[in-house]
Swiss-Prot record:
NCBIfam families: 16S_RimM. An accessory protein needed during the final step in the assembly of 30S ribosomal subunit, possibly for assembly of the head region. Essential for efficient processing of 16S rRNA. May be needed both before and after RbfA during the maturation of 16S rRNA. It has affinity for free ribosomal 30S subunits but not for 70S ribosomes. Gene3D superfamilies: PRC-barrel domain (2.30.30.240), RimM (2.40.30.60). InterPro entries: PRC_barrel-like_sf, PRC_RimM, RimM, RimM_N, RimM_N_sf, Transl_B-barrel_sf. It holds the Pfam family PRC_RimM. It comes from Picosynechococcus sp. (strain ATCC 27264 / PCC 7002 / PR-6) (Agmenellum quadruplicatum). This is Ribosome maturation factor RimM.
Length: 175
């Protein structure tokens, strides 16, 4: 399958314990992807995705990490062997979103324009999730700017036109 047929939902960052569990750093706002049993895919560097069965998963309290158990991973050595693997789902398995909700993968790469002047400010290069979502915008000089992803500051997101508009407070792009 082509790369656009997959959505990266996380990455295996470490083994957890001795019985084949792994820690996953998620890149999705849908925790059920790591808590509900079912088919997922693992992709090691320079390899095609391989189907795996998620047996169980749980979030580590107070951390943005999940501990999951895949069916074929039985011990710590096997768990260590998949460290660095991307965890994938098929693009067709994307959850339906409400109005003004977006998939991270749809935001990365959008062109960013000033809401008032329509001047190009840069491109969305990343999204950080914490107390509130923050867009990382990289300008033409490769300088990175952090923009709170809230309606008051980002009033326009147009996925069809591959753009968003920022009504930035003074100085946000001048720092």
């Amino acid at each position: 399958m082509a790369e656009q047929d997959w959505i990266i939902i996380g990455q295996v960052v470490a083994a957890q314990g001795l019985k084949g569990e792994v820690r996953i750093n998620p890149s999705t706002d849908f925790p059920e992807r790591f808590e509900v049993p079912g088919q997922r895919w693992l992709q090691l560097p320079n390899q095609d995705p391989q189907s795996v069965e998620l047996e169980r998963g749980r979030q580590i309290p107070g951390k943005n990490l999940f501990v999951v158990k895949f069916e074929h991973i039985q011990d710590r050595t096997q768990a260590e062997n998949i460290r660095g693997a991307k965890v994938l789902v098929r693009a067709g398995d994307r959850p339906e979103l409400e109005a003004d909700e977006y998939h991270v993968s749809d935001l990365i790469g959008l062109e960013v324009f000033d809401y008032n002047t329509q001047a190009k400010l840069g491109i969305v290069s990343d999204l950080y999730t914490a107390a509130q979502d923050v867009l990382e915008v990289t300008d033409a000089n490769q300088k990175k700017h952090l923009v709170p992803f809230v309606k008051a500051i980002v009033p326009v997101v147009d996925l069809v036109e591959n753009r968003l508009e920022v009504d930035a407070p003074p100085g946000l792009f001048e720092i």
